[in-house]
From Swiss-Prot:
Keywords on record: Acyltransferase, Cell cycle, Chromosome, Disease variant, Dwarfism, Intellectual disability, Metal-binding, Nucleus, Phosphoprotein, Transferase, Zinc, Zinc-finger
Catalytic activity: L-lysyl-[protein] + acetyl-CoA = N(6)-acetyl-L-lysyl-[protein] + CoA + H(+)
Phosphoserine: residues bearing it: 29, 75, 223, 244, 312, 512
Protein name per UniProt: N-acetyltransferase ESCO2
Disordered as annotated region, ranges: 222-243, 282-315
Enzyme Commission code(s) on record: 2.3.1.-
Organism per entry: Homo sapiens (Human)
Disease note: Roberts-SC phocomelia syndrome: An autosomal recessive disorder characterized by pre- and postnatal growth retardation, intellectual disability, microcephaly, bilateral cleft lip and cleft palate, and mesomelic symmetric limb reduction. Severely affected infants may be stillborn or die shortly after birth. Patient chromosomes have a lack of cohesion involving heterochromatic C-banding regions around centromeres and the heterochromatin regions on the 1, 9, 16, and Y chromosomes.
GO cellular component: cell junction; chromatin; chromocenter; chromosome; Golgi apparatus; nucleoplasm; nucleus; pericentric heterochromatin
Amino acid sequence: MAALTPRKRKQDSLKCDSLLHFTENLFPSPNKKHCFYQNSDKNEENLHCSQQEHFVLSALKTTEINRLPSANQGSPFKSALSTVSFYNQNKWYLNPLERKLIKESRSTCLKTNDEDKSFPIVTEKMQGKPVCSKKNNKKPQKSLTAKYQPKYRHIKPVSRNSRNSKQNRVIYKPIVEKENNCHSAENNSNAPRVLSQKIKPQVTLQGGAAFFVRKKSSLRKSSLENEPSLGRTQKSKSEVIEDSDVETVSEKKTFATRQVPKCLVLEEKLKIGLLSASSKNKEKLIKDSSDDRVSSKEHKVDKNEAFSSEDSLGENKTISPKSTVYPIFSASSVNSKRSLGEEQFSVGSVNFMKQTNIQKNTNTRDTSKKTKDQLIIDAGQKHFGATVCKSCGMIYTASNPEDEMQHVQHHHRFLEGIKYVGWKKERVVAEFWDGKIVLVLPHDPSFAIKKVEDVQELVDNELGFQQVVPKCPNKIKTFLFISDEKRVVGCLIAEPIKQAFRVLSEPIGPESPSSTECPRAWQCSDVPEPAVCGISRIWVFRLKRRKRIARRLVDTLRNCFMFGCFLSTDEIAFSDPTPDGKLFATKYCNTPNFLVYNFNS
């Protein structure tokens, strides 16, 4: 059959189109299994033509070795189909195990060839094979169908029986001479292979904390590498400075001659300074650099000369180590030179310090001013901001729960304290159109004494009065001013005394406070004066002030303290008055030199 069938097919060999159609129907995807790479559509057309010619001529060449067709030397690719496979005498279907074996054999062949021809293969790939991009590296991993054939190259299939098929193949690759491609080919010589093509491993980017750790390690390595080089350069610079002092002097002289006409005036001074510096260079290495001083003109010229040579830039570090703190006050013109970067850094640091000082000053000024920030939103509510209770007189913030709680407590206690119920045998000593004054003695009933104690506690809290044990508690007299609303709005506690001290008047200067603003501190004389009545406490309810309640209480005291006698202002004294009490005593006595007692000396 093998001898007869080619003759039958040879008769119809002139009909290439029908033969090609027949082979395509018989083997629908010969190129799908064995074609991996193809450059363009033109190569695909050449492939079909070469296959047609091969099918026609293969009938005459059935007795070849290995039953494989010879490659057409005119075409860039070999035929992918043999006569044996065409007549179904060889099984072309490969199960997954057989495919795995083929891949392993192919990889071993490639490894052995690479070991034998390591250097020439690398050079050949450097010249001929261009570097594939990421897109081309990703595409071979997809399904190898006819849809992707124009993007891949055509390679002859490898059989299990023939392991030397790579030697029989002839692959034509374009030669592109590029340095970048050569470099990438060398780097990727040991890269992993996918479908017998070398690809780059996917770049993994370090993320999170690993990125910063890697960066720090690289910086440390670079710093360690740079340290020996810096030490060598510094040593070389120091050697050049020690050996060539005369050369630097000559260079500076030539540079001074090139300066603008303004510097020509300072040329003679510069020469003298440079000669003295070169002669005393060794001595200045031992001495302190801060002993000598340099004129401002020489320093300016030295700044211009600092740009002339690199040797003069490094002399600061070697010759004058102490001048690094304040290089302006360095020993000589040679030692006082600084580079442009150091000068810019010093100027920038000075400007930065000035800016920080200005910011600190502005911040202190802002904090010294009273802040007027609105801490509560005004949404048109009725109770907003600081409010004054009409009953107890406490100032509180209505929207603050803490203030409201404190107000409720104080309000309840205050109302209980000033509330006056009255009793039958009360002692009324004076009556007015807006109230009356009631006198309470120590021998009165207990409910009256209890009421006096409540009022006294409230008065002591408001005045900040220091509790003092009275000398004669049985002779204390308490005067309460009761308003028409049945509330205690004024209180005066008096006790008998024998002597008091006169308050010394203070000189009123242009900067001293006015008479309406009385200071807390006051002075009194050491000479005691006789007195009869001492006012221990006098208090008026906050909302009832400026209604002459305190004056009426003192008038009643002067009239009722001693039977049948009206006391003068020189016979009454006040105990350690507050600023408001001092102002009241000054107005009531018509003199700032009133009498005081019971004070802490």
